[in-house]
Structure formats: structure tokens, C-alpha cells
């Protein structure tokens, strides 16, 4: 689509999809969690709108990586990195649309990693092989919805119990009893310099980490059978987490801070990816009956705040999403110490996929809820 035509499109979700397609050539694609998230959002927009160009783009993206023998370009099992699983969620719909066995083989290749992926002594997945005995909130989103869709698609219900175990374990270990918020990560060995030596938890409530977790739970529930005996456990976890998140929503803007509970600390800022993830997770949770209806007010405030404060429209109608934290992790080389100063020092990148993908998903949810925002 010609960029000058984008401003004539009626919804924010499709305007962002068109803006993304205009600036995201296939040669820049990466088999990585953030690109997978962005492409999944484009696919969801295609399913809802019926726009074939969106689905065609997704097909081309998947085919750019999946070889005829089912191996995945740039992916290696032995890296044992949960971040590399998330893009695999696109393989299920590719398989359903085509019946092509190479997509099934690619799915099984990713499951090979998950079958042997290192675990903590309490049987939770390490975030990555290079981060021993560590569980990160991010990792629940990276691996668990994929496994849940696999369990549903290929009728392997025993996987659901292990998925729920991982969610319950990390919530138990990272939840702060005073605020109800979740710390970014947990080191079972309590050896990392970034962790509290008594609890093993990192020291701050990073908005996007909690956003990953909320998105993971609402997406896992898409596949978990309605009659599963532990389904209510996930619903209760979702409610606890959302209740805590809504309490720290900024009153003036409707957005959320990079470090959730320290709005007045110098350097903290209203961050886009966490805010878009919260709007998506809350709105979807309300729509599907997991959350009380009154939470839609929080989602609406957040959505309005995103459009009012973080979305820019250029002369061609292309959208830009500002204030996206480009990346934040713990440990590694150079070592990331998990301090407040570390989290606020990470580079801010406009239109980073980790913000654009959740923005599209959030906008689709709000549009389904009948919210018609005009900037």
C-alpha cells in the first residue's frame, strides 16, 4: 500500500500493520521472539480483517526461514534458548492453512529443544542454557503458549500440567507479597550478582517482564481445555497480577512506568511495550471472562494514553510508536546488574517490534470491544 493511503484507513490496528509492512522488508526478518511477536500480530489482524495481504506476508515470512526438510534457518536446538521458540507459534497456522509437512517437522524440531531444555531443580525451564538455574518472566511467554498450542493441536494433554507448573513456580518465586507485583527473574541458585541473596529474585518490577507474563497467561488459556482441573489456577494468577498492575497505572496518562512502582524516581519514564502488553492482556482477559468487567476501564485508559502520548503520525500517515525500551536482561557479558540505573539506561528505540506487536494486538482487542479512539 502507498504510504499516503495509510492515513485513510479507519482503525489503529490496520494503520500500524500497514506502517510496519511499509518499513519491514523481508530481508530484515529474524527468527527471534520479537519479530515473531510482530508477525503474529500482523497475522491476527489478517484473520480479523480478512485482508489477504497480511496472511500472504506471514506466509512469506515463515517460508523465508523454514527449509524443505523442516529445519529452520539460523536456528539451532543446542543453543537451548527459550527466546527462539516464540516465532514457532506461526508454524501451527502455516500447517493448518497448507497441510505442508515441513511445518510439522519444524514444530517437532522446536519441541526437540523443549524436551531436553535444561531445568531448575524445581523443574522449571532455565531461560537459556547460558543462564543456569534462572527463570525469567519473559521465558514464560517465549515457550509456554507454543507448548500449549502443540498440546492442543496434537492431542498431548499431559503437556498442560508441565506448562501450568512453570507458570505457578515462577509466580510463586517472583511475587512480592506486599505489592503483588512480580520481579523480573529468579535465580534458584542465588548466585547471580543481580539477585537478592535471600530470595534469588531480581530487585525491580520491570514493566515489560510483567507484560510478557500477563500475555503468556491469557494466550495459554486459549488452548487449555475448559474442563482442565487446573485452569482456574491460571485464571487466579492472572487476576492477582492484573490487580497489582492496575494499582500502579499512572493516573494522569493511563500508562505504566518502566519500573512499575517508582514513578517519582529520577530517570523513570512511561514505557510503551509494557503499557501495550498490559492493555492487550487486560482487554483480552475481560473479553474472554477471565477478568471482572470493570478492568476494561483500565484498558481503555491505557489505550487512550498510548494513542495520546506515544503514537506519532507523519506526513504520509505512517505511525511511529515512541518510548519502547529496546532491550533489558540480566547477567551476560557485559554484565547487566539489574539495578534501577541499568533498566532506565537501556536504549529507547521507536517502533521496536516488542512494542509494535503488542500495540497491534491491543488495538485489535480494543476495536473488538467497540472502542473507537481518534487522535
Question: What label would you give each PLM region?
Answer:
Residues 7-28, 56-73, 105-124, 157-186, ...:
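Long, well-ordered core segments of solenoidal/helical folds
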Residues 138-153:
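Acidic/serine-rich, low-complexity amphipathic helices located in mid- to C-terminal regulatory regions
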Residues 49, 98, 150-161, 220-232, ...:
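Inter-helical turn/loop segments and adjacent helix faces that build the functional surface
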Residues 140-141, 204-217, 276-278, 359:
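Alpha-helical bundle segments that constitute or directly flank the non-heme di-iron/ferroxidase center
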Residues 214-263, 267:
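Oxyanion-binding "anion nests"
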Residues 20-23, 40-45, 79-94, 126-142, ...:
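Carbohydrate-binding/catalytic loop surfaces
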Residues 3-36, 48-55, 64-82, 86-88, ...:
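CBM-like carbohydrate-recognition segments
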Amino acid at each position: 500500500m502507498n504510504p499516503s493511503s495509510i492515513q485513510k484507513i479507519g482503525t489503529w490496528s490496520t494503520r500500524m500493520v500497514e506502517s510496519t509492512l511499509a518499513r519491514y522488508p523481508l530481508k530484515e526478518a529474524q527468527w527471534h521472539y520479537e519479530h515473531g511477536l510482530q508477525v503474529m500480530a500482523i497475522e491476527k489482524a489478517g484473520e480479523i480483517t480478512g485482508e489477504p495481504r497480511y496472511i500472504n506476508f506471514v506466509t512469506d515470512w515463515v517460508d523465508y526461514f523454514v527449509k524443505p526438510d523442516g529445519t529452520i534457518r539460523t536456528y539451532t536446538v543446542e543453543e537451548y534458548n527459550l527466546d527462539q521458540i516464540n516465532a514457532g507459534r506461526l508454524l501451527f497456522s502455516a500447517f493448518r492453512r497448507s497441510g505442508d509437512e515441513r511445518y510439522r517437522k519444524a514444530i517437532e524440531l522446536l519441541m526437540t529443544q523443549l524436551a531436553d531444555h535444561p531445568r531448575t531443580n524445581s523443574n522449571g525451564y532455565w531461560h537459556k542454557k547460558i543462564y543456569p538455574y534462572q527463570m525469567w518472566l519473559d521465558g514464560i511467554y517465549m515457550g509456554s503458549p507454543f507448548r500449549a498450542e502443540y498440546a492442543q493441536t496434537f492431542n498431548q494433554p499431559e503437556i498442560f500440567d508441565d506448562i501450568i507448573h512453570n507458570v505457578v513456580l515462577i509466580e510463586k518465586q517472583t511475587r512480592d507479597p506486599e505489592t503483588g507485583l512480580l520481579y523480573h527473574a529468579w535465580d534458584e541458585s542465588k548466585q547471580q550478582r543481580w539477585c537478592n541473596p535471600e530470595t534469588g529474585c531480581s530487585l525491580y518490577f520491570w514493566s515489560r517482564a510483567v507484560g510478557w507474563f500477563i500475555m503468556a497467561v491469557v494466550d495459554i488459556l486459549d488452548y487449555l481445555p475448559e474442563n482442565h482441573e487446573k485452569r482456574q489456577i491460571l485464571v487466579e494468577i492472572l487476576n492477582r497480577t492484573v490487580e497489582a498492575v492496575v494499582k500502579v497505572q499512572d493516573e494522569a496518562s493511563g500508562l505504566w512506568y518502566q519500573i512499575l512502582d517508582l514513578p517519582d524516581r529520577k530517570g523513570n519514564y512511561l514505557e510503551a511495550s509494557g503499557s501495550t502488553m498490559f492493555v492487550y492482556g487486560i482487554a483480552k482477559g475481560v473479553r474472554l471472562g477471565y477478568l471482572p468487567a470493570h478492568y476494561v476501564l483500565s484498558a481503555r485508559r491505557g489505550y487512550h494514553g498510548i494513542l495520546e502520548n506515544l503514537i506519532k503520525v507523519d506526513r504520509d500517515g505512517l505511525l511511529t510508536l515512541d518510548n519502547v525500551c529496546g532491550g533489558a536482561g540480566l547477567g551476560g557479558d557485559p554484565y547487566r546488574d539489574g539495578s534501577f540505573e541499568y533498566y532506565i539506561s537501556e536504549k529507547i528505540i521507536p517502533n521496536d517490534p516488542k512494542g509494535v506487536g503488542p500495540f497491534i494486538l491491543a488495538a485489535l482487542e480494543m476495536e473488538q470491544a467497540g472502542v473507537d479512539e481518534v487522535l
